[in-house]
Design a protein with these regions (language model features):
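Intrinsically disordered, low-complexity regions enriched in small/polar residues
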Residues: 9-12, 24, 51, 64-67, ...
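RNase H catalytic domain
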Residues: 49-52, 94-193, 211-215, 219-227
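RNase H-like nuclease fold core
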Residues: 11-12, 17-116, 136-137, 189, ...
Length: 236
């Protein structure tokens, strides 16, 4: 039968819908793929870690913005893990856009697109963390032993490899509005600041329970801490 999957159909079919508790999608999201293919899609992400609030919780926010229409998808993933830190929040923020791009390429609108043509497209993702950028731009390299946050880095690399288009991570300076008015900043800088604010707001709102952890391959939620999370990641 023909593929009749819409963007929302795919997102709502993913397991562990609690992961998507904060996700705002303008006009159903079916504009995402045309925006990418026309070169009008801007993507940015940023993480948050507040050890004074919790030493284990972190969050990662992301915005996908169409420059032609102004339509957006905004989201935030929250995680509570013994491995929680700022880097984990940054990695979480990078996984959201990759999952949503996968959703866009899984819709009926993508069925008739020549895959060889799609492979010629390159989508930029802007991030202020150089570790995320380095791993995101090297999706086929293996990780060194004892690599911090290896579980999420493996997911970042895996999701990148499986996308039909090319992904390029680009550095954007964080907190650019410290010395420059917001309205004078570039679009990636503005999106980065908005992601930073969103990640902090949802981090404070969420306050995840101690012992909960999330893995986003599938998607599954586990409640047995870092060891259970690592075991499931190794099964990927």
């Amino acid at each position: 039968p023909p593929n009749t999957t819409s963007f929302l159909d795919y997102v709502y079919s993913l397991r562990n819908q609690s992961l998507w508790d904060y996700l705002e999608i303008d006009d159903g999201g079916d504009w995402l793929l045309p925006s990418l293919l026309s070169g009008n899609l801007a993507i940015c992400n940023d993480g948050s870690y507040m050890p004074k609030l919790s030493k284990t919780a972190c969050s990662g926010a992301f915005i996908l913005h169409c420059k032609a229409t102004g339509k957006e998808i905004k989201g935030c993933f929250c995680d509570d893990s013994p491995n929680g830190d700022n880097y984990r929040g940054e990695l979480l923020s990078g996984l959201g856009p990759l999952l949503l791009l996968k959703a866009a390429f899984s819709t009926s609108a993508a069925t008739g697109i020549d895959q060889a043509t799609v492979q010629l497209y390159s989508q930029s993702l802007h991030c202020d963390n150089k570790g995320v950028i380095s791993h995101g731009n090297e999706p086929t390299t293996t990780l060194r032993s004892e690599q911090p946050q290896a579980d999420l880095i493996r997911l970042l690399k895996s999701y990148t490899r499986k996308l039909p288009c090319n992904i390029t991570w680009i550095h954007v300076k964080g907190h650019s509005d410290d010395h420059t008015p917001f309205e004078e900043l570039s679009l990636p800088q503005q999106l980065n600041i908005r992601c930073d604010e969103l990640a902090k707001i949802k981090h404070i709102d969420e306050k995840p329970g101690v012992g909960q952890a999330y893995t986003i391959k599938g998607i599954y939620r586990v409640d047995d801490g870092a060891e259970g999370l690592a075991a499931r990641i190794r099964e990927i």
